[in-house]
């Protein structure tokens, strides 16, 4: 029970202290603002390695949200350090090129690939071997986590054993997205096309689907936790339903956790669902990482 509480408090810190900074955490070796690319200042990550005798470790990677145009890795600082301290897992939180730099989903996925390669190398330089990793993302970060994991099966620098999506977009052609007219140009920019509106988005379906995790579902994708609120007015609940159904049909494993009445924030609004989510993360991490 104590570890469940610790895991809960570590992740909930994201929502309570978005910009909290604290001194070095005992038992954690911290590496801040490591450049994993040379194209943009955005290509930086923070890495936390556990100070433990057994250097064979699991890794949890956090990808921040912010509508692909805002947000920062430091939002996950306390969450990442808490997991490394309490569970002995390596953790990383990364920034990536966003829409303001004219990046599309292609560049964003390239950044995740580069970041994982860099993390593996940095860990090895310090005597660690990363067994596998879990990807955890919220909103836009959840979309990128899913899209990366599904699209790149067979080419991970570090094996991806699971993905956790908190309110993540999964199908950019879902009509329910376009009830909010402001979302259309944003999704178009993400997919690399201009002129997308709530009235004409169907004409861009091919491009939008290329940027949608639902397009890359197969029996080989990592097991996935989908968490979504039924009252989400930014990313429609139907997006999670669509992906869950597609994964089930393909023979992929999907744990779909519904947060009744929750909006886009998801966690903390449904205690029973939150507990189920945290327990699932703990179980999967222990099983996949071996401790």
Question: Residue ranges of each PLM-predicted region?
Answer:
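Positively charged n-region of N-terminal signal peptides that target proteins for export
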Residues: 1-4
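Sec-dependent N-terminal signal peptides
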Residues: 6-10
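Alpha/beta-hydrolase superfamily serine-hydrolase fold, recognizing
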Residues: 12-291
